[in-house]
Curated annotation (Swiss-Prot):
High-level lineage: Bacteria, Bacillati, Bacillota, Clostridia, Eubacteriales
SMART domains: HDc
Domain of life, per lineage: Bacteria
Family statement: Belongs to the dGTPase family. Type 2 subfamily.
Organism whose genome encodes this protein: Clostridium perfringens (strain SM101 / Type A)
Protein name listed in UniProt: Deoxyguanosinetriphosphate triphosphohydrolase-like protein
Length: 342
């Protein structure tokens, strides 16, 4: 018996009945021979980690643009924190940890430069709109490996596609593992963005709404602990009642929504980031404008997309893959004069 089959058999003994068993995956778009030692979701995890798009996350903004401190989150650090939170919840629920890890590590592969500012600019540019979760799937299916894609399992792609959305009416992933990542993403970013905001001097601990802090906890670690435990125990209750879904309790969920709204009002859309937001928008818009008019200068992969799917699509894919630094350097290369000594 192969090592992979031993792992799959162990899943049958260990995992919850609502988990996604690796040997029940609906598969990939392109058929492949199974790996001898890794399950299909382990293979997906490894492909994501070794992809160029994953490495570029270290140079993409989470919230604070061009911060020079060593401890502010980048998109890569956010991704790793999401993976940690999601795996903690998943192990407590006896779900498939490898599927959770693959979805969590891949969920932001398509995020643009300059955080959600890049997403907003590309959304205005691309007919039909731009969403980072959809772009993450596109990166995995079409952009990576020079257009071949990573050929991930459909469960991982589904989890990546449906990790966004905060309301109860948002579409959810078809697996419990995907639903866990959706909550872990929110738990991670709300709490680490508060931490970064305090580090940047925008917020003080005492600025946080007292009624919310009394429910969720005074520190970041306390809030994460509260949210993770509530998610685990409330989900167990749901399963026991025949309602198989991942969720928070009403009290904790309502407090969490209020805390997120506080962040949007005071940080994401607040005055502190307004000037930097305008600068980032200007850089992105000018680089987009240049390559829209000169798309023949883009790498071959994106030129081919322009010919097959239109210039807007090809330029969007190229810009979305840029890091903050690369996009800024492109702007400087295109628009800033080079000073030459005569």
């Amino acid at each position: 018996m192969k090592i992979r089959e031993n792992i799959e058999n162990f899943e049958r003994i260990k995992l919850n009945k609502v988990a996604k068993f690796s040997d029940e995956s609906v598969g990939r778009e392109r058929l492949e021979e199974p790996d001898e030692i890794r399950t299909c979701f382990m293979v997906d995890r490894d492909r994501i980690i070794h992809s160029k798009s994953f490495r570029r996350l270290k140079r993409k903004t989470q919230v604070f643009i061009r911060t020079y401190g060593d401890h502010y989150r980048t998109r890569l650090v956010h991704t790793l924190e999401v993976s940690q939170v999601a795996r903690t919840i998943g192990v407590a629920l006896s779900l498939n940890e490898y599927l959770i890890e693959a979805i969590a590590l891949g969920h932001d592969l398509g995020h643009a430069a300059f955080a959600h500012i890049g997403e907003d600019v590309l959304n205005d540019f691309l007919p039909g709109g731009f969403k980072h979760n959809e772009q993450s799937v596109r990166v995995a299916k079409k952009i990576e490996k020079n257009g071949l894609g990573l050929n991930l399992t459909k469960e991982v792609l589904d989890g990546i596609l449906n990790h966004s959305g905060f309301s109860n009416v948002s579409k959810v992933a078809g697996t419990f593992e995907g639903q866990v990542v959706r909550f872990a993403d929110k738990i991670a970013y709300v709490n680490h963005d508060i931490d970064d905001s305090i580090r940047a001097g925008i917020l003080k601990e005492e600025d946080l709404p007292k009624n919310i802090i009394e429910i969720l906890g005074a520190s970041g670690s306390e809030r994460i602990n509260t949210l993770v435990k509530d998610c685990v125990f409330n989900t167990i209750d749901n399963i026991d009642k025949g309602e198989p879904r991942v969720s928070l309790s009403k009290e904790i969920g309502d407090a969490f929504v209020q805390l997120r709204k506080f962040l949007f009002d005071n940080i994401y859309l607040g005055k502190y980031l307004e000037d930097e937001r305008k600068k980032a928008e200007f850089i992105l818009e000018k680089v987009i404008e240049y390559y829209y008019n000169n798309w023949g200068e883009m790498p071959e992969l994106y030129r081919n997309i322009c010919e097959e799917e239109g210039i807007h699509r090809g330029v969007t894919d190229y810009i979305a893959g840029m890091t903050d630094d690369y996009c800024t350097n492109e702007f400087n290369k295109i628009y800033i004069p080079k000073f030459v000594m005569y």
